[in-house]
Amino acid sequence: MRKILVTNALPYANGDLHLGHMLGYIQSDIWVRFQKLQGNQCIFVCGSDTHGTPIMLKAKSLGITPEELVTKYSNRHLQDFTDFEINFDNYHSTHNSLNKEIVEDIYNKLNNKNLISKKAIAQAYDPEAKMFLPDRFVKGTCPKCKAEDQYGDSCEVCGATYDPTELINPRSVISGQSPIQKNSEHFFFDLPALEKNIKDWIESNTLLQPEVANKLAEWFEQGLQSWDISRDAPYFGFAIPGTNEQKFFYVWLDAPMGYIASFKDYCNKNNINFGDFWGDSSSESELYHFIGKDIIYFHTLFWPAILSSTGYKTPTSVFANGFLTVNGKKMSKSRGTFIQARTYLDNLEPSYLRYYFASRLTSRIDDIDLNLEEFVTKSNSDIVGKVVNIASRCAGFIYKKFDATLSGEIFDPELESEFSKNHDAITQAFEKREFAHAVRLIMALADKANQFIDYHKPWQLAKEEGQEQKVHQVCSQGINMFKVLIVYLKPIIPSIVAEAERFLNIQFISWADAPKFLINHKIDKFKPLATRIEKEKVDKILEDTKKMLENEQSPQSKKEEPKLDIAAECTFDDFMKVDLRIAKITEASHVEGADKLLKLILDLGGVTKQVFAGIKSAYKPEDLIGKHTIMVANLAPRKMKFGMSEGMVLAAGDGKGIYILEPHEGAQPGMRVK
């Protein structure tokens, strides 16, 4: 029995999953199910990737905390996976104490080996947003191939990697402004020092895809560079120890460690020895990472380097899949082809898409096209017309005429032998992730089964006197061929196969026993296992996707010229009654039991006031201490549930964010604002 640990790329918890995501998860799930059917101990883990600037900014725009945002999308992702029959043994998150402990431990080990250094670098800084910009928040023209609208770290056209400062005509994704260059001290991982480790891993990896090997050779030729593993505050993630929460681990450092955390969490729950699967290099277990082709760089350079230098087993291999196109073109919201997983599930069963993807997937990193017309035809022809049809043509005769019991003899041993002889070829195809080849072999057998039934015509034999035994044997062989096919298809369409197993009255058949026919075996009454896809269902998926786009755009498309909702006019004397003062925030803290409030202690130049301000969604207490702001100093004190509020801090807001007012330098606590 093999010990196999499989991980899948962690989905980023700031949006819903689409069918392009599902391609990779379905691929790995099929392979894992196949391994388990063979009797191997195969553990499948995943989790949510939850850190980074995109999550921080989206949460802020929604007026919620990053934790609330990632919880929302993690739950939605897991439900989509469950409904698509992606059967993870454990689903975790990168935002928890276990992952933090692992990240800091690995960082300390790297640091102790002098593989971490610090140096000041020029970074893109958005003066309007007042923050350093992550690589993906800078866009511009690729410095290598001159493709426009490329991210600040890599080009999606030519695959080049570079520094954001190298972009031509860069702009901030946040404000649209041209970023300025500003120095900041960052932490770097010495990747070049571990080049030999990486090359040794590549040489020992007999399963590495040729496309990956070629890309690695290209990167080595360009020369490895030290890797910036830090990001400046503000940032949602784990602070680097000893930086007073001013520097944070780059999301791509802590995200892969989420694999370790998810598996360790599984081990803790199930009393499994972590080292048996993910110990050091001497471990005989197998470790596989399934990923999309856009993240090969991180998983085949940085990840093996980090693992090999910190005492962890390196991957047995990394398997990458291509992107998904729909009807021959890039997924598009305007065409209704940017289909979310949930939109598909609201209209169709997952088995059809799982089967279609399997029929197109190979071990190569090829893009897969979801041709919707072919999708309907193939699902109806193969699943319904070929496989399920075998059982529906034979089951009634067995159930009604022969006490639901299969024959004790095999009618056509030669045909049975042909089904048996294909077992090894189908097994090898699944093992090598050549699912398209496996499907072709399985469907070729389904064709032979249907030809056998067509030739003997049990529906006609049943009308002829003295042909009862032949009807029994022909239909029994048909049911047995169906049984072989559904075992082979179990990794691909598990829910349909589960229904078929109930009909066949079998609880579990191992992969090795798949070709064996059932003799004198009692079956149950046949019920339809799958129905044909109507074209209208697919059309509705496209319509629902377009409507989703319209709903997203409607607030913008109907946007009128901004109108200021000016309050009722007041006199100068009325205004002068309001005493506005410069105040320094000397203390700031959370208010227990309050969702929106922070407690502020304000210094007005010798006079101290306590204020409860509804700014919790926008600011951390520690970020406010020492700031100057403006307050209404003569507002009548107001007794609140949490204490006395002795004024009001001024802030601006548009429903998307809250921004406290800060005076220019030189303004001192106690000065009056006029």
From Swiss-Prot:
This protein's name:
Methionine--tRNA ligase
Q: What does this protein do?
A: Is required not only for elongation of protein synthesis but also for the initiation of all mRNA translation through initiator tRNA(fMet) aminoacylation.
Q: Which GO terms describe its biological process?
A: methionyl-tRNA aminoacylation
Q: What gene codes for this chain? A: metG
Superkingdom as given in the UniProt entry: Bacteria
Q: Which residues bind Zn(2+)?
A: 142, 145, 155, 158
What are the GO cellular component annotations?
Answer: cytosol
* Cofactor(s) the record lists: Zn(2+)
Co-factor binding comment: Binds 1 zinc ion per subunit.
- Organism field: Francisella tularensis subsp. tularensis (strain SCHU S4 / Schu 4)
